[in-house]
Design a protein with these regions (language model features):
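C-terminal extracytoplasmic interaction modules
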Residues: 1-146
Length: 146
């Protein structure tokens, strides 16, 4: 399901793995495609889970009863610490050079009265389109306090 979704989104990743552990390579891939990994208890195999707003159909969403939750911690984000801009670095294959651009949350910049930026590196994206898609997802997460 994850591979089909990534293909449909056109999120091509180009990279050569050398001298990395398998888990390190998987974690780097997950960073680029906004995903996580879990181990399937029945098979013992790793599974990639994409973090998307509409990843599950409504009938696939499971509810967890509060009695099943042993502990939960919320970390309240201070409004002054919310990220409202990301500076993105990627490799531009068409121009054969490293490139960068910025994406910002204008409303938050106005609210805070300043830019609070974080840098995202996507060395395995070879075009701005893919880096921009994932950077927007990451900015959405970073700019939303819990």
């Amino acid at each position: 399901k994850a591979a089909d979704r990534i293909y449909g989104e056109g999120l091509g990743v180009s990279w050569s793995i050398t001298e990395k552990s398998c888990i390190d390579a998987i974690n780097e891939l997950c960073y680029h495609i906004e995903a996580g990994i879990r181990v399937n208890r029945q098979t013992g195999l790793y599974e990639i889970v994409l973090f998307r707003d509409n990843w599950f159909e409504e009938n696939e969403i499971h509810t967890i009863s509060e009695s099943k939750i042993k502990s939960m911690q919320y970390e309240i984000t201070n409004a002054d610490e919310v990220i409202n801009q990301v500076n993105v670095n990627f490799y531009d294959r068409a121009n054969i050079k490293n490139s960068s651009f910025s994406i910002s949350e204008s409303g938050l910049i106005q609210t805070l009265g300043r830019v609070n930026a974080e840098t995202l590196d996507f060395p395995y994206f070879m075009n701005m389109r893919n880096a921009e898609i994932v950077a927007n997802w990451k900015l959405k997460l970073l700019s939303t306090g819990v």
